[in-house]
């Protein structure tokens, strides 16, 4: 790791930084292909005020980041944030970058009426992610079942 300070910031509309982050996610999460939606779709996603994209940079290199969604409540006037993906290049892991990304999101949340942040992770073959989240200062861990209704792509969805 070079001696550059780690800079953490929102991407806003920087599509190049977003592509760099997606490339990191692709390698870390072993996506089948490094293939993404077209540029117009990704720009529209970045313009969505409920979609948050935060990157960590060392010098000019994107070394990690996270994507998250703001979810507004209908029970009270607060919101939650769901962390969709979080990843740091392998050579920068275990150096506080992931924790700094979480802390950046926490500070943003405190000043934007966000009541909580939550994230989920696969329980099988995902020991590193589980260990990482357990090292952060979370308030609770809940076992949750997820049910997915596949509507596009493989298989036929049955009517309920």
Q: What do these predicted ranges mean?
A:
Residues 3-21:
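A short beta-loop-alpha structural element at the N-terminal edge
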Residues 109-121:
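Conserved GNAT acetyl-CoA-binding A-motif
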Residues 94-107, 135:
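Conserved acetyl-CoA-binding loop-helix of GNAT-fold acetyltransferases
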Residues 55, 61-70, 82, 87:
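Conserved beta-strand in the GNAT
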Residues 32-53:
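Active-site rim helix/loop that mediates acceptor-substrate recognition in acyltransferases
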């Amino acid at each position: 790791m070079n001696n550059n300070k780690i800079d953490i910031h929102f991407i806003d509309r920087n599509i190049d930084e977003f592509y760099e982050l997606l490339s990191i996610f692709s390698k870390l999460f072993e996506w089948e292909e490094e293939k993404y939606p077209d540029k117009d779709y990704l720009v529209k996603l970045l313009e969505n005020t409920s979609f948050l994209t935060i990157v960590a940079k060392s010098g000019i290199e994107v070394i990690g980041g996270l994507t998250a969604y703001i979810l507004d409540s209908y029970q009270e006037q607060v919101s939650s944030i769901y962390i969709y993906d979080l990843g740091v290049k392998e050579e920068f892991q275990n150096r506080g970058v992931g924790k700094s990304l979480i802390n950046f999101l926490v500070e943003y949340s405190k000043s934007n009426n966000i009541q909580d942040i939550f994230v989920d992770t696969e329980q099988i073959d995902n020991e590193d992610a589980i260990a990482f989240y357990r090292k952060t200062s979370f308030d609770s861990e809940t076992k949750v079942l997820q049910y997915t209704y596949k509507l596009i792509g493989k298989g036929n969805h049955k009517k309920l």
